[in-house]
Amino acid sequence: MEEQHPLLERLMFLLIFSSNLDEFFEIRVAEQMTQLKYGREAVGPDAMHPKTVLDRISEICHLIVDRQYKILNDMIFLEMEKENIHFIRRHLWTEEQTAWVENYFQEKVVPVISPVGLDPSHPFPRLVNKSLNFIVELDGKDAFGRETGMAIIPAPRSLPRLIRLPDELCDGGDNLIFLSSIIHEFADELFPGMKVEGCYQFRITRNADMTFDMEEVEDLANTLRGELHSRKYGDAVRLEADQRTPEALIEFLQKEYKLDESQTYRVNGPVNLTRLMAVRDLVERNDLRWKPFSPGVPGKLKGDNVFDALRSGDQLLMHPFQSFTPVVDLLRQAAKD
């Protein structure tokens, strides 16, 4: 990445890339997988069979995702440290910080978290598209005497993925911790009487394409409501997991979601980078951002009456480089005319 660009803008570029890649898998990759699922052999405009397309996508995406995390870890995070912006790992928490985090866990996390033990009476839960989850290895018996062995912890979507530590607990700068670190640290408190042998984050991307025939739809609103709900639980198209996840757990998740190695991405960092966009609101460092851009207004549209400007000829606005305000003024004046 170009180092002359502001640091936080480079971070945002990486995060926007993640968001775009999510949508690519939800729609484009899902479309190719659907064609394979139903045995459609038709090739696309590029004369490539869906299986060939998917193989090529996997090859390229694995390379660029690896590069993305390498840039994040070896460049962006290191430069943020130099700028006194810290993502504090669990093993670096002080006693005071640990006490504060534990209180946050008890007051904010515990009331809204719902771990699910995996046993014959608790099958694998339905996990929402792109949600952060943890697969946990357990040893021992739960409060009901059951040997669970494994559990799933869905991270509460109502909680922020980044939490800022109080300034009085730190030695200056901006100090942030991941919600995933909090859940990792205190996961054992969610399973009384059992020992947590391992806790690993993962995320499933699902088919979010909406497919229906407009000519056959009688109630468009109800159809859209149904399609929007089903987007959360469509067929899995990608598995992302912490690279430290044991192979046995990876294979368990692959089997559960009917995915193979080509659809699995082992990452060295947070599995949902888009949630790091909260950094914009948590870190007030304008020196690490682009200067705010103020869109201009063409000279003829600066007057009080937009209709006078239009009578003199057509006016072209180039959004976002020029302000949208004249359009709003036009509607407001037309409503009063």
Annotated model-derived regions:
Residues 1-337:
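N-terminal localization/anchoring segments of enzymes in phospholipid and broader phosphate metabolism
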